[in-house]
From Swiss-Prot:
Record keyword Ribonucleoprotein present: yes
Pfam families xrefs: Ribosomal_L33
Alphabetized SUPFAM superfamilies for the sequence: Zn-binding ribosomal proteins
Keywords annotated in UniProt: Ribonucleoprotein, Ribosomal protein
Transmembrane segments: none
GO CC term, one of those recorded: cytoplasm
Coiled coil ranges: none
Protein name as catalogued: Large ribosomal subunit protein bL33
Family that this chain belongs to: Belongs to the bacterial ribosomal protein bL33 family.
Top-level taxon: Bacteria
GO molecular function: structural constituent of ribosome
Length: 60
């Protein structure tokens, strides 16, 4: 049995700039270690709908 697997959770990252512009949002799924990273993630990812890199924020 693997030890410590319960610390990793699957999260969804959603584009914040597309929401403001009223366009289709882009979403990414990834994992994070909730023990080491307790606050919500903010990452710069590519949004294919806007065709540029934008800030993606962790949602529930």
């Amino acid at each position: 049995m693997a030890k410590g697997k319960e610390n990793r959770i699957v999260i969804t990252l959603e584009c914040t700039e597309a929401k403001k512009e009223g366009k289709t949002v882009s979403r990414y799924t990834t994992t994070k270690n909730k023990k080491n990273t307790t606050e919500r993630l903010l990452l710069k990812k590519y949004n294919p709908n806007l065709q540029r890199h934008t800030i993606h924020k962790e949602i529930k």
